[in-house]
């Protein structure tokens, strides 16, 4: 039997590296790394890591918002491999758009409405992974990274949920709906510490002081461990109620669809990939072009009962595909 030669290919990493000092979502635990063995004393090196399930480039599972939702470890491994496409929205709702400048001046996010995505219907019908490029990854580490980034609306989430082929929606942004400007301080941008289990943490790890959580937190119904919850003051300023409700609603719509749409947040280097640009004229549609699609792997760690997890994400391009540098 003759062997079929596969076309040459190359990989582009879409993952943000994890390490101490990486900014985290306000209220989430900092990434921490401490050696438990050293070359000089033990003859080998071993490291204890502590980090939240939604740190860096990560996937959200239905269990993130639904007590009976699927966990990441329940999905077959081939769920995380598929063809992907990038929608370049920088000029319409992203950092290069007129809409971005005006709302930012009053601290409100640009809203990504169904009408912004409707020209790309053919792409959503064609590939299981769709990534939205808005130019936000370049703002990582700035105090405004969580402020007013281009945000989905519940109506847009409903629109996306109607595409049966879609199984992973990828974003550069840290969530689906932004904090309004001014809702948290620059100190919060590097992440207040939420304590882990005392038995897990060595003395070298800082931990938040104990407290009595409100009745609405750590209840038996939610299954939350009260020792892992910290007071509001420990988490930085809370989301505005409207933004929190919109973020939760968008998550619930997409993660709650049957089958669910998983959410991949914190992507980088999307600008290096082939992409679909918006149409030049209102009312025009963008036709799917298979040459602009690419195979992608999105591999989270295999952790039992995971509501989310950092993931290694990589796109495989044909060797003759342009590596776009902008």
Model-derived features: where do they sit?
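Active-/binding-site microenvironments in catalytic and ligand-binding cores
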Residues: 1-326
């Amino acid at each position: 039997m003759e062997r079929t030669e596969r076309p040459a290919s190359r990989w582009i990493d879409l993952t943000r590296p994890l390490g101490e000092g990486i900014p985290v979502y306000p209220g989430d635990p900092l990434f921490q790394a401490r050696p438990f063995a050293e070359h000089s004393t033990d003859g080998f090196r071993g490291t204890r890591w502590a980090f939240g399930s939604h740190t860096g480039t990560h996937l959200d599972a239905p269990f993130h918002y639904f007590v009976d939702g699927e966990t990441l470890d329940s999905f077959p491994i081939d769920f995380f491999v598929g063809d992907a496409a990038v929608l370049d929205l920088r000029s319409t709702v992203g950092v290069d758009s007129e809409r971005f400048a005006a709302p930012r001046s009053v601290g409100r996010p640009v809203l990504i409405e169904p009408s912004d995505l409707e020209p790309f219907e053919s792409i959503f019908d064609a590939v299981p992974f769709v990534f939205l490029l808005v130019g936000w990854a370049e703002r990582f580490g700035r105090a405004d990274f969580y402020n007013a980034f281009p945000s989905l609306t519940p109506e847009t989430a409903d629109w996306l949920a109607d595409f049966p082929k879609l199984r992973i929606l990828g974003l550069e942004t840290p969530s689906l709906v932004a904090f309004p400007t001014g809702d948290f301080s620059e100190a919060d941008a590097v992440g207040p510490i939420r304590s882990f289990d005392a038995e897990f943490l060595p003395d070298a790890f800082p931990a938040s002081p104990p407290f009595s959580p409100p009745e609405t937190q750590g209840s038996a119904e939610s299954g939350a461990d009260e020792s892992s919850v910290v007071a509001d003051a420990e988490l930085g300023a809370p989301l505005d109620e409207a933004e929190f409700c919109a973020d939760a609603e968008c998550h619930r719509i997409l993660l709650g669809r049957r089958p669910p749409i998983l959410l991949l947040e914190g992507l980088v280097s999307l600008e290096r990939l082939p992409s679909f640009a918006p149409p030049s004229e209102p009312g025009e549609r963008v036709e799917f072009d298979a040459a602009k699609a690419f195979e992608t792997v999105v591999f989270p760690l295999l952790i039992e009962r995971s509501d989310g997890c950092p993931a290694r994400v990589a796109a495989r391009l044909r060797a003759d595909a342009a590596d776009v540098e902008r």
